[in-house]
Amino acid sequence: MVTFDEVARMAAELPDVAEGRSHGNRAWSVAGKAFAWERPFSKADIRRFGDATPPAGPILAIRVEDLGEKEAALAAQPKAFFTIPHFDGYAAVLVQLTKATKRPPREALTDGWLACAPPRLAKEFLAR
């Protein structure tokens, strides 16, 4: 299990990350672009689950490079990573933190950061 405090520490290890709030929830951004954020389910999200039980516990949304990367992330971590209809066509995955170990969210945060970071900053980071 991963907590939001651990997510905050992982995000803070990346260059030029700012932690703030979006819609009252924690969010992490680089150059003004959010790459990860706390994403509780809305009433509409809950209704869309119908008779199925929604994933429980804290949910983290993480940007990905594109929809192909989204599908790859979902396939690689099917127990912890998922999506909902609200995210159809949007390059982001959801992570059920109670089912995640530290490594996949750390890698996904880095990928999300790379998707949102200015090219120069991303290039410098990758050159390390």
Summary of predicted features, one role per range:
Residues M1-R128:
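Charge-dense, helix-prone N-terminal extensions
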